[in-house]
């Protein structure tokens, strides 16, 4: 399966270790996986992928506010309606569930079918989650 991971850290920086671990876990199951940084990539062809995984790090300590790159990347892409997707949120504070709910709402607003969501605790947890895709 062709999978794209859209990495949206709270600030502009290279993909964090948990994103690389998620990619490693998905690739170990035989999937073709690309990682895209939402802050720097502009020419993303999302319809070419069968599955879209969005992994976000909340910008507020309470975990409810999403980075501005999330809205920009989802609203400017076409071909997202009906696309199977996963929503992942890096645990940053006590109210991470609210942030995950906001992330899923943003994705579903653009027509994506979110069929998997989870809160990522650390890199080994992300790799274990990656191995569960398609299983």
Could you say what each language-model-derived stretch is?
Residues 2-10, 14-135:
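FMN-binding flavodoxin-like domain, especially the glycine-rich phosphate-binding loop
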């Amino acid at each position: 399966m062709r999978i794209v991971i859209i990495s949206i850290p709270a600030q502009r920086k290279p993909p964090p270790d948990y994103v690389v671990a998620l990619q490693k876990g998905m690739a170990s199951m035989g999937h073709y996986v690309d990682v895209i940084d939402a802050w720097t990539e502009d020419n993303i062809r999302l319809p070419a992928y069968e599955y879209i995984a969005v992994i976000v790090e909340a910008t507020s300590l309470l975990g409810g506010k999403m980075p501005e790159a999330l809205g920009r990347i989802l609203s400017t892409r076409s071909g997202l309606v009906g696309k199977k997707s996963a929503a992942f949120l890096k645990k940053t504070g006590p109210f991470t569930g609210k942030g995950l709910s906001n992330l899923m709402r943003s994705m579903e607003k653009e027509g994506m079918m979110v069929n998997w969501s989870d809160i990522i605790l650390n890199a080994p947890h992300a790799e274990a989650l990656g191995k569960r895709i398609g299983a």
